[in-house]
C-alpha cells in the first residue's frame, strides 16, 4: 500500500540529515518526483498525493507548505520514520543519487519540452495537477 508523500518526505529529510547531506525544499520536491516516476515506471505507486505544475517544477503542495519556512536553506530535521524494506531498497539509491545534483539542473530536467510538467504547465497553467499516467509516460 502506498505511503503518504509527507511520510516519504520525512524519510528523505531524515536520511539526508543523518548522512550529513541535508537538502532544500526545492531538492526535496524533485527527489519526491523522481521517486514517484520510478515507481510508476514499474507499475507501482510510491504515494497517492498528486503533483502540481508550479513555476519551478512538480510540487506536492502539502509537503511544500510544511517546509517553505526554510526557504532555500537546507532542512536539517530528524524523524523517527522507517519505510518498508521493499520501498527503501528502491528509494535510497534515488535519494543518494539525486541529492548530489544541483537543484537547478533538476528543475531544468523536469522543465524539458515534452515532459509531464511542461505539458501541464504550458498547457493548463500554474498549480494544475500532473496526472500520474502522464508522469509515467513522459517523466
Predicted feature residues:
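Domain-edge interaction signal
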Residues: 1-139
Amino acid at each position: 500500500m502506498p505511503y503518504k508523500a509527507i511520510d516519504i518526505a520525512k524519510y528523505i529529510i531524515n536520511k539526508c540529515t543523518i548522512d550529513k547531506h541535508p537538502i532544500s525544499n526545492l531538492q526535496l520536491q524533485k527527489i519526491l518526483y523522481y521517486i514517484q516516476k520510478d515507481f510508476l515506471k514499474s507499475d507501482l505507486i510510491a504515494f497517492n498525493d498528486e503533483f502540481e505544475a508550479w513555476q519551478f517544477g512538480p510540487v506536492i503542495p502539502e509537503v511544500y507548505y510544511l517546509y517553505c519556512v526554510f526557504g532555500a536553506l537546507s532542512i536539517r530535521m530528524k524523524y523517527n520514520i522507517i519505510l518498508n524494506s521493499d520501498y527503501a531498497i528502491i528509494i535510497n539509491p534515488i535519494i543518494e543519487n539525486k541529492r548530489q545534483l544541483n537543484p537547478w539542473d533538476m528543475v531544468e530536467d523536469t522543465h524539458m519540452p515534452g515532459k509531464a510538467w511542461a505539458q501541464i504547465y504550458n498547457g493548463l497553467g500554474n498549480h494544475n495537477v500532473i496526472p500520474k499516467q502522464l508522469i509515467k509516460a513522459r517523466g
